């Protein structure tokens, strides 16, 4: 079984919606939480968020993974300055321009039910490097979880990805803001 990763503007929007499913957090959020802020993503306007995502898909801001032709995974990737939540976050110990559009950010993964634990997120994390570089990024960064060995994670925490997936792809840890979170970066 081969996992392929493509920029989202090279696949059907229906593939993204298949990955998100009809219910649950991904279907409700439409990957707008980091773009709109947490309160706005919980409004009842799912259709409005879906249309925002459609526009981002046209711009190529994201990746889709297929397993033997079946859509199985999504990863949000765009200039860091596109994410309102990241611009509003306090960055203790980091002194850089949050609006620098040459730094791209990976904020969210969705793996379709029935296809988890098969390397989908790892393939997507690795795929962000070429896509960001091709779009003119100077670097790509992510904010993954680093759960303690043998410890359970709370439902939904891993939507930002696992630290190990990014390290395996060649990202370097640049900051550790908490015991369970790292900031990783791949410089071009």
What function would you assign to each model-found segment?
Residues 1-39:
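Conserved N-terminal entry element of GNAT/NAT acetyltransferase domains
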Residues 66, 71-116, 150-160, 167:
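Conserved acyl-donor/pantetheine-binding loop and adjacent beta-alpha core of acyl/acetyltransferases
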Residues 66-68, 185-188:
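Active-site beta-strand termini and strand-to-loop segments that position acidic
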Residues 133-138, 146-176:
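Conserved active-site alpha-helix within GNAT-family acetyltransferase domains
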């Amino acid at each position: 079984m081969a996992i392929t990763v493509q920029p989202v503007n090279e696949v059907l929007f229906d593939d993204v919606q298949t990955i998100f499913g009809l219910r649950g957090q991904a279907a409700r959020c439409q990957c707008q939480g980091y773009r709109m802020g947490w309160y706005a993503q919980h409004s009842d306007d799912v259709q409005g968020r879906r249309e925002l995502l459609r526009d981002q898909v046209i711009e190529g801001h994201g990746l889709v993974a297929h397993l033997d032709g079946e859509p199985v995974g999504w990863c949000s990737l765009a200039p860091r300055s596109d994410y309102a939540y990241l611009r509003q976050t306090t960055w203790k110990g980091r002194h850089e321009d949050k609006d620098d559009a040459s730094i791209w950010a990976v904020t969210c993964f969705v793996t379709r039910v029935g296809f988890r634990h098969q390397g989908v997120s790892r393939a997507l994390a690795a795929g962000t490097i070429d896509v960001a570089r091709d779009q003119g990024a100077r670097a790509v960064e992510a904010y993954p979880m680093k759960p303690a060995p043998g410890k359970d994670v709370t439902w939904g925490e891993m939507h930002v990805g696992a630290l190990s997936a990014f390290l395996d792809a060649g990202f370097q840890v640049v900051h550790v803001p908490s015991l369970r979170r790292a900031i990783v970066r791949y410089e071009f």
